[in-house]
């Protein structure tokens, strides 16, 4: 985990690298990374402090039960757990998002 205060771009870079590693550990390929990157880009622009003005969704994955201030690794881990449990993969989650406007 990075030390000290990071600027917004460094946080986004760190979050993306962390997510790529988690996907790699799960044996998922670059297609899944591209889908995840697109999905969370649409949801939060990879901003770990993103707040949805219309709901309680927060953070990179825009989860409803994500507390403000949740560390980036925990946001990524919880987001990937949600995607895996609900959709099976980032590509399926992105497809749902493209069809419905949410995931």
Language-model features: locations:
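Peptidoglycan cell-wall recognition and remodeling modules
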Residues: 4-103
